[in-house]
Amino acid sequence: MLGSLLLLAPLAGAAVIGSRADTQQCPGYKASNVQENDRSLTADLTLAGKPCNTYGTDLHNLKLLVEYQTDERLHVKIYDAEERVYQVPEKVTPRVDSGDGSSKDSALKFEYEEEPFSFTVKRDDEVLFDSSAENLIFQSQYLKLRTWLPENPYLYGLGEHTDPLRLSTTNYTRTFWNRDAYGTSANSNLYGTHPVYYDHRGESGTHGVFLLNSNGMDVFIDKTADGKQYLEYNALGGIFDFYFFTGSNPKEASIEYSKIVGLPAMQSYWTFGLHQCRYGYRDVYQVAEVVYNYTKAGIPLETMWTDIDYMDRRRVFSLDPDRFPLEKMRELVGYLHDHDQHYIVMVDPAVSVSDNGAFNRGLEQDVFLKTQNGSLYKGAVWPGVTAYPDWFHPDIQDYWNSEFSTFFNAETGVDIDGLWIDMNEASNFCPDPCTDPERYSSENNLPPAPPPVRSSSPRPLPGFPADFQPSSASRSQKRIVKAKVGLEGRDLLNPPYKIRNEAGSLSNKTINTGIVHAGEGYAEYDTHNLYGTMMSSSSREAMQYRRPEVRPLVITRSTYAGAGRDVGHWLGDNFSKWEHYRISIAEGLAFASMFQVPMVGADVCGFAGNTTEELCARWASLGAFFTFYRNHNEIGNIGQEFYVWPTVAESARKAIDIRYRLLDYIYTSFYKQSQTGEPFLQPVFYLYPEDENTFSIDLQFFYGDAILVSPVPDKGLTSVDAYFPDDIFYDWYTGTPVRGHGANITLSNIDITHIPLHIRGGSIIPIRSSSAMTTTELREKSFQLIIAPGLDGTASGSLYLDDGDSLEQKATLEVEFEYRKGVLHIDGKFELHASLVESVTLLGQGKGGSRARREDGTKKTIQTNLELSKPTEIKLE
């Protein structure tokens, strides 16, 4: 079935738009028929007085379900008794098993008051959540619940945003309504929705609260007039579907969250190399020239990307026949593959409404969104008038698979290695109400005019094929009443309660929220925030359909909770400003550690506006210490490829040299997160959870457990005041010990091509003996081990290796390293042949043997030439 555009009147009895103050008079609910056992609790909730109908009609009868799912997780669900109210579909967010937990073993305790109904969640008698702050409201188009918080709480999460890592607790609003957020402005809703917050309470532990609800929502964090701290949910629909989870520290809490939304997808080895892109490469010759220039500059380029420039008039699944002809594109991709490099292009969701294959086939299969009268729902984006795929349509995956397998066919098409999906909030340039997308497209020059055609490259590109050298010469869908799909009679376009959407009305610059999707009949009003994540999962499946044996890399702009199961995320259309250089750290940390989307990074050097040599040099270093490392900028701005400026080129070479030597450390840690949820990129407080000085740090971070990154934060600076917790660290470059005492240390004379790095004591890091121009070449290099003893003189680390690409591995290497009392112990699973460990470097003071070589008295290196094939012990002192 297809979608329809419904203009529905509000439910009978609903009041006109009220105010937040009106809700304080609502009666709340009374609990009755309470049934309780060791594993669960159920109850009926009945409206406790006269309906207030503030932003819709109060629902009289609700249900309460409480499940002690595990010792660390509690599920609390409040929903309508008839189960007609919309709930997030299980196909989007698969539900975790109810588990075998019990109230007597659980670290979390549920308690309630019958009238007015409220509940608390406690951990060891400490109140974590207390909904008695105000009466519960459950209306047809408005849900409200407020919880008390402790004074001056340390809260994190509630993404996507570009605010500080630690959330403000005064007059702060987080709005969930995915939008095309050019410029990624602070204090506004951005591309993704992650309705989870973490509350870190130092020694007593960390807990999280995840609300499984995809409706538009405001979350307020503020104080009452008498100074009491609270957090308040205000949603446009859905139900209260809470998951409370706890850990003794923030890292454990993040692991618990991964058990709810799913573990992140493992990525291929090559994806951790350097990526280069730009919106505005004029033709295939310029793309080839960029590849050549990177090689000439000695800067390792792993993957070349192309934005929508490659398309014929910006139409998806098409090639510009003059600027990106098929035969030249196949030659370009062939060249990259022959040189162990990779290629990625962008695909947007919107399909041009014109005589083209992708549109005609989609129209024939009836997989696009439609209006109530059976006509095609149309918007306007880059190609002009567009149709939108309906990700709920039962045939959409077949359509998407077919388009991918045809256009990206290895034998006849553009054989891409990964995928970039954009504009999937979904974006619509045509303002609401978009009554004439044809006129809007015409008046706004959509699609934009392409650049002049060139018949060949303007200069020789040695090594490229001869062609790259300079030339010598109808039906409608009515709404069906089903369980958990949504109440009838709601105003899906202008709900009484107005969330603080930066774009204005719900439908402005996006798909009309009155659309009803195919299949079960979900409304866009309820599922808007799922559009990008549904495109993500369909695109991952389509990539896997054409290459079923390998891990598909898909990078998306729009996300919802759990998106990391399928995709990685880049942080959107930022600016080439120092402010955005800095905020990329906090935003990236939130995605990687708190939202379980670990493949993440910003547009290095900035997307919008002209970057500067200094900013780009610093950012080239910083970007190397994210998992996803891509230089990308906008059409019309100056070029910012790393080779453009000598200092930027040098900064990139130095940073990539370190990154590539660390690539197996990165790969090992990323694999661990894909298996257990243990974060790789981490805020400082994740490793020092009892040091309150670390709780607000978001300009330093840990690259895995072992490496502290302390970037220079601003223009013109050559020093940074870096915080060192009470621990031992070692300078990455010199091995010099740095004894932290829980205070800042000023690091001075930091060259523009340098980024301060310190190894955390207690770590063993496997590195490659040298860098390489590609990750394929890198995998042939031998290993070295760096041992950085902790304050107790011990250290540990691990190494995971596989073939680097396959979904199913035939053999792996999983090695554990331990150093204690002068002896290195190596144990594990040795199925896969690995390169030799040519040397072991021991940092810190110590007595060396006859094979030891000292450097400034701070480290010694022992040549080993050890084969990682069996358990081994090596005496180092």
UniProtKB/Swiss-Prot annotation:
Key word Signal present: yes
Region of interest (Disordered), ranges: 432-476
Principal EC category: hydrolase
EC number(s) from the headed UniProt entry: 3.2.1.20, 3.2.1.21
Superkingdom, natural source: Eukaryota
GO CC field: extracellular region
InterPro entries linked to this entry: Gal_mutarotase_sf_dom, Glyco_hydro_31_AS, Glyco_hydro_31_C, Glyco_hydro_31_N_dom, Glyco_hydro_31_TIM, Glyco_hydro_b, Glycoside_hydrolase_SF
Database matches in Gene3D superfamilies: Glycosidases, glycosyl hydrolase (family 31), Golgi alpha-mannosidase II
GO terms of biological process kind: cell wall organization; polysaccharide catabolic process
Chief location: secreted
Pfam families: Gal_mutarotas_2 (PF13802), Glyco_hydro_31_2nd (PF01055), Glyco_hydro_31_3rd (PF21365)
Catalytic activity: Hydrolysis of terminal, non-reducing (1->4)-linked alpha-D-glucose residues with release of alpha-D-glucose; Hydrolysis of terminal, non-reducing beta-D-glucosyl residues with release of beta-D-glucose
Function: Glucosidase involved in the degradation of cellulosic biomass. Has both alpha- and beta-glucosidase activity.
Name the UniProt record assigns to this protein: Probable alpha/beta-glucosidase agdC
Protein species of origin: Aspergillus oryzae (strain ATCC 42149 / RIB 40)
Species lineage: Eukaryota, Fungi, Dikarya, Ascomycota, Pezizomycotina
Gene, per the UniProt record: agdC
